Amino acid sequence: MSKIGRKSKIALIVVFCIVFCVGIVAGAMAGVATKAIDNQKPDEFLRSWMSYVSDDTLLTDIVIPGSHDSGTTKMMWAAKTQDKSIKEQMACGARYFDIRPQLKDGKLVVFHGPITGEDVEPIIDDIKQFLTANPSETLILDFQHFMSDETAIEKTYALLSDKLDGLMVANKTELSDLDFVKSLTLADTRGKAIVFFGNVFKNTTNCDYINGKNYLFQRNGDSDTRQGSGLQSFYDGSLNRKSSKKYLANAIPKYVDAFENSEGGLFVMQMQLTDPIAIIGPKFYEGTHDENATRFISSLPGKDYFGRVNIIMRDFVGAEKCRQIIALNKDKGTIANDKLSEFASKCA
């Protein structure tokens, strides 16, 4: 055999081995990623679970399932954090939504990093339909980031004013927005959405655009607290990029401490991991995290900070993940006494 022929054969063997190894790794990663998916079917209880909560319960005391980067179901794998539409997530019991609008070709679309996805308007239509059909429920809409320029904020505001007129919680009192949010009971908010806006480009300044609009409330930045914010949600990329166990052991206590040192209000406990290289994608990392996160959530009633647990935000939310979070309301004491037994059976 000639040297050229021998080299060609070796090269083919090397290529085959590389392809084989890549296939093995890809298959293993795909297997891990499937663990992220919640395939449990929703039921009527999940659609109206807030009907079991006492009217006089403060909104800040209810344990609420939420979704991270809620409108990403149609995005490519690197940006996709949900496999269900917001309409489907609402049916599964989620009541907090992280919606990030960007102006693209004159239309508002959802973005996650550099990737864009579905139109915002149909999402708002679904929210209106859900609130109208389910007057016992309350939604928390967190428009925490905007892309493009201030036009994206203006168009989002106009869209909400048009579509959700009469369905948004409004501060018509003499209270500051922060004190107003802290005072809200479920009776005050049933059948409505409470809407929070973040800043346009940076997390360091107050969101001045909400001034004079009594149904827009300010939320904090990822790493700081904007003065007067009614929603606190903390994020440190260096922590969220850790392994699942390190994240739960180190990040959650830090975020709880940050909330305790804040002015208060609604508290979003971020339960998702971040892809450290932005290539593998959220689905794989949620697959490595789901079992640990589920176990951690089950342990929350035994934590000394359980009283502060409010909104728990996850990737790839579905009926099973939401039901587990909703069930914590029994331990929180937020369920009406005459509905407690039925609630417990629905969560079992």
What are these regions (language model features)?
Residues S2-A36, Q40:
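Alpha-helical transmembrane segments in eukaryotic/viral proteins
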Residues G27-A94, D105-A133, E137-T138, F201-T205, ...:
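Long, acidic (Asp/Glu-rich), low-complexity accessory segments flanking structured domains
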Residues Q89, R100, L141, V195, ...:
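Conserved, mostly hydrophobic/aromatic
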Residues L103, H145-M147, F201:
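Active-site-proximal loop/turn and secondary-structure-junction residues that shape catalytic pockets
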Residues D119-I123, S161-D179:
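Acidic, His- and aromatic-enriched active-site or binding-groove loops in soluble protein domains
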Residues P135-E150:
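Active-site groove signature of glycoside hydrolases
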Residues I153-K163, N206-N214, K283, R323-K330:
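Short, aromatic/basic amphipathic alpha-helical patches
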Residues A170-D304:
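Surface-exposed substrate-engagement region within the catalytic domains
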